Structures are given as C-alpha cells and as structure tokens.
C-alpha cells in the first residue's frame, strides 16, 4: 500500500492524476502540467509536499552536532528563523541528501529532508548523533504546503490570521517563523517568491481549501519538476547522490571551508577531490526541436582538441522559454558550446550557468 498524505482526498476533488512517488500516492497533475507551471510563473500555485520529512534537532549539543553532520555551517545562523541550504555528506564526500536547516534557538534546529531518502537519512543521523547531547525527533504529524508565484504571498495573506500576517511581514527570503499553529518559511523549489508552510495534519485540509478559494492553483509533481529545473535547482537522485561530490553538483557555494578546524563529515575526502579537480554541473539550452532527457550523452572538444564526454542529469522542455533545457555533469574543460546525442544524431547546444529562469524571467 502506498502512503497517502492528509491531502489525498483534496487532490481527488480537484481531479488529480495520481502516481506513485517513492512509495507515496502523489498528484502528477490536475489536468494540465503546462497550465500549472505557468500559474506559478505568472500568478500563484500550490503543492502538497507533506511527503517531505521534518526533523527537529534539540539539545545542548544541537549546534555542534549539525556542524559535524552538514557541509554548510549552522554557526553562521545568528538570527532566529534563518535557514541554510546544504549537503549531508558521507565520509567519502558523497551527497547523502540535500536539505534545509532552520535555526530556531541555540538548542533547537529544524531540518527538512527529502522523502525518497527518509530512511537512509534518519539511519545516518542516528549513527552520527552518538556522543552528542541531542534529541532527534521526526514530526510525521506535520503536513506541508508550498505556495509559490508572484501573487502567492498576497493570496496566502487572505488565508492567514492577523497574527500570522504580522509574523511574516517584511520577512526576508530563507527565513521561517512559527505563527500560531503554522510554521511559515520564505523558501521554495520553483525560483519564485512564496512560502513553504508546515501545518498540523488536522488543519492541512482547511488551509488547502482556503488557498484554493483564494485563487491558488493546485500543482502536481510534473510542474514541480519543470519549475525547479528552470530555476537550476538540483533533484536528489538525478543531479546528485552518494556517488557524486557536491563540487560536481553545483553545490560548491554550500561548502563552509572556514573555520578550518571544523571537522565536518567528508571534509578530508572533499579537500582531496577539490585539489585533484572534479567534474562540474552546467546548464544546456537547445533551441532546435526535441527534448533533452536524463542519461543522454554530451560531447565537446576541449582546448587541446581532445573530444570529451559528459552526461545529462536532468532535462525537459521549458514552458517559460519555449525550448529544451538540461543540466549535465561534464569535464571542467567545457566551453560555451557542445553537442547532445539524440536519436543517433548529434545536436548543437549552448552551455550556460545552471539557472535558466528566476522570478519569471530568463536568467542567463
């Protein structure tokens, strides 16, 4: 039996096409993936992300533990509510998961991890916590709804109560605040403004219904994937996993090398990889007809005239741009053009930074 989120019946009410997603019954779309995608880029859309795993890390050693566990440094978080994105690495510097950590107090952090990696993540965290005065508490009684798009905050404001609206007023990106029963964060996976709202399960259906009545369009996994790829955001399992180090996954900016005496998991292996050089993740755009798909091969000739090869990690048709975009892991010597092998032919592509659309506009 697949797991169902507390919003399952709400999806059926909106005629969702349901699919299995890592053991969860989740909406693929509600009739038109393109319309859902465009709603988020132009107005407001919402996603059921209740399958994500919320974990509270509490105790006197909470900060010290997370400084060991994560490649980014939670000691940088000084203001309550501030959030941090980063990787949880194994001892070989492979990416176990990418996650967001919220600093609530010196003894309380909240971590949100991917659903597909839940069991692996929790097992790794339980192993690493030995010796630290820390309690790890999973919060399965919490649901999560992401409301994204240029009009998302205004429409959510009509559903929030006065205290909640006061709590989020002027809140900068990458913050979270507990406002009555809701934990409201200015984070997302679309490249648009908006909120990710953690809500008690018994209130989730009413919140979803309120947002629906406020004119927020329900969106499924299909639109979530095209939106995140346009935004150049990694998908765990495609763009990185335990066989990939963060420097080869466009996550170098999330590695806190300073202070030098912070011994985070995988640091020694990652430093050796950095010194030796590693592949990189780039963006590709193809204005010719066709769609670039994961697993396709990328070819280019380096500065010394030698043919080099890489692999597409994520690829799709971009509804916003009107042509195919992709992310590819390639040797660092790549220039600004390459070729992708499609149907036994090579098609020219442009190489760009892996970020295609932000706030509804072309980003490269």
From Swiss-Prot:
Entry keyword Transferase: yes
Key word Transferase present: yes
Sorted UniProt keywords: Aminotransferase, Transferase
EC numbers for this chain: 2.1.2.10
Protein name per the record: Aminomethyltransferase
Superkingdom of the source species: Bacteria
Pfam families: GCV_T, GCV_T_C
Entry similarity comment: Belongs to the GcvT family.
PANTHER family: AMINOMETHYLTRANSFERASE (PTHR43757), AMINOMETHYLTRANSFERASE, MITOCHONDRIAL (PTHR43757:SF2)
InterPro entries per UniProt: GCS_T, GCS_T_bac, GCST_C, GCV_T_N, GcvT/YgfZ/DmdA, GcvT/YgfZ_C, TrmE/GcvT_dom1
Biological role: The glycine cleavage system catalyzes the degradation of glycine.
Subunit (UniProt): The glycine cleavage system is composed of four proteins: P, T, L and H.
GO BP terms, alphabetized: glycine decarboxylation via glycine cleavage system
Enzyme class: transferase
Reaction(s) this enzyme catalyzes, per UniProt: N(6)-[(R)-S(8)-aminomethyldihydrolipoyl]-L-lysyl-[protein] + (6S)-5,6,7,8-tetrahydrofolate = N(6)-[(R)-dihydrolipoyl]-L-lysyl-[protein] + (6R)-5,10-methylene-5,6,7,8-tetrahydrofolate + NH4(+)
Cystine pairs: none
An annotated GO cellular component: cytosol
GO molecular function, one term: transaminase activity
Protein species of origin: Shewanella sediminis (strain HAW-EB3)
């Amino acid at each position: 039996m697949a797991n169902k989120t507390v919003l399952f019946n709400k999806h059926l009410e909106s005629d969702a096409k349901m699919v299995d997603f890592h053991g969860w019954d989740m909406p693929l779309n509600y009739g038109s993936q393109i319309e859902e995608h465009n709603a988020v880029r132009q107005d407001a859309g919402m996603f059921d992300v209740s399958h994500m795993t919320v974990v509270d890390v509490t105790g006197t050693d909470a900060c010290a533990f997370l400084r060991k566990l994560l490649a980014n440094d939670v000691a940088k978080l000084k203001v309550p509510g501030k959030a941090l994105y980063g990787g949880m690495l194994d001892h070989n510097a492979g990416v176990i998961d990418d996650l967001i950590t919220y600093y609530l107090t010196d003894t309380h952090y909240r971590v949100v991890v991917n659903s597909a990696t839940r069991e692996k993540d929790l097992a790794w965290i339980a192993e690493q916590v030995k010796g630290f005065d820390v309690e790890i508490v999973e919060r399965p009684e919490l649901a999560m709804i992401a409301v994204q798009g240029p009009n998302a905050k205004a429409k959510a404001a009509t559903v929030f109560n006065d205290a909640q609206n006061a709590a989020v007023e002027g809140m900068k990106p990458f913050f979270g605040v507990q406002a009555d029963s809701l934990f409201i964060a200015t984070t997302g996976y679309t490249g648009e403004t908006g909120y990710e709202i953690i809500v008690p399960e018994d209130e989730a259906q009413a919140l979803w219904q309120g947002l629906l009545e406020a004119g927020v369009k329900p969106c499924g996994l299909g639109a979530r994937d095209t939106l995140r790829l346009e935004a150049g955001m990694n998908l765990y399992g495609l763009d990185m996993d335990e066989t990939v180090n963060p420097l080869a996954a466009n996550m170098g900016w999330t590695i806190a090398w300073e202070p030098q005496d912070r011994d985070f998991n995988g640091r020694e292996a990652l430093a050796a990889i950095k010194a030796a050089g590693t592949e990189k993740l780039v963006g590709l755009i193809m204005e010719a007809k066709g769609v670039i798909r994961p697993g396709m091969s990328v070819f280019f000739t380096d500065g010394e005239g030698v043919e080099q090869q890489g692999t597409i990690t994520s690829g799709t048709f971009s509804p916003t741009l009107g042509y195919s975009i992709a992310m590819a892991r390639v040797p660092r010597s790549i220039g600004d053009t390459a070729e992708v092998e499609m149907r036994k032919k090579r098609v020219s592509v442009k190489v760009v930074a892996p970020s295609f659309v932000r706030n509804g506009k072309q980003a490269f």
